Amino acid sequence: MLTERQLLIFRAIIDHFTWTIQPVGSKNLLKEKSLPYSSATIRNEMGVLEEYGFIEKTHSSSGRVPSEKGYRFYVDYLLQPKKLDKSDRQMIRSFFSENYYEMEGLIQNSALMLSDLTNYTSILLGPEATKNHLSGFRFVPINNFQAMLILITDQGHVDNHLVTIPEGTTLSDIERMVNILNERLVGLSLDDLKVQIPMEVKELLGKHVRNYESFMHVFSDSFAQASQQKVYFGGKTNILNQPEFHDINKVREMLHLMEEEQDVYELFRDIPDGLQVKIGRENNNSLMEDCSIITATYNIAGERVGGIVLLGPTRMEYSRMMGLVDVMSRDLTDVLTKLYRDNQN
């Protein structure tokens, strides 16, 4: 579609805008990139690129910038995920060589590391909680009025809930209740727990535990919270530091979105397998018209369980960012699978 000369000039425009965020004309492009063409030739070829819709003129300058269509062509046909440089690879290798004993901390720290490497906002979608199976739980009294309810799933997820101990409850009541629940509920999915607690467990608790009605509310609320989908952020406000976000209303709306974790989960829950890039208006969200999103999924023991989202400006350094997300997906899969298998033994 494009000649070698047009491709070279187009790449130079992309590279210029990635690092300067400024429109560029033929004279500056020639001076900056030392292209082997005259200014007139570059100007003519830029005219062709504009006719194709790959670059466009801004309102405030006579120079040109890449368009969404141009970025789409660039990502689809002109680049591959970049092989990580030594410092990136070393940081990731060092991170994943640590010993991790629970899934939640590993995923959260992965989100933080990805944002540190990119200076963009990273979002990791946790495994679908309702498919997790209960491995066991503990009820640890803190004082006469409060206790910590600790739920552990088969995928290494640990959920802690500070709960109020119902009035008149004794330690022996708590011990009996924990034994009953562990006996009846271990191995069930969190989704099934919603059914089992009000049906079978309620009757058992009524026979063996005083004031069991209050316990029912405590456990029902805790299991409901544990069933919520988990979203882990790294650099939540990094995207707002980009020059594209100078509109205070857009900043406010984006901050509000980031605070609604379940909305964020629904926004990205259906990301496809493999490394994917959505650019600008392809995101079908007015808040993200100036953003590009790179996504990948991660697995545990061959089963897809979560997603990785990197949110940055449309002028991002795509090859490096795609390389980082791709490596993160594969390495996180390996470590989570090992953690899962260790927990099965």
Curated annotation (Swiss-Prot):
Keywords: Repressor, Stress response, Transcription, Transcription regulation. Signal peptide: none annotated. This is Heat-inducible transcription repressor HrcA. Belongs to the HrcA family. InterPro entries: GAF-like_dom_sf, HrcA, HrcA_C, WH-like_DNA-bd_sf, WH_DNA-bd_sf, WHTH_transcript_rep_HrcA_IDD. The keyword Secreted does not apply. NCBIfam families: hrcA. Pfam families: HrcA. It comes from the Bacteria. It comes from Listeria innocua serovar 6a (strain ATCC BAA-680 / CLIP 11262).
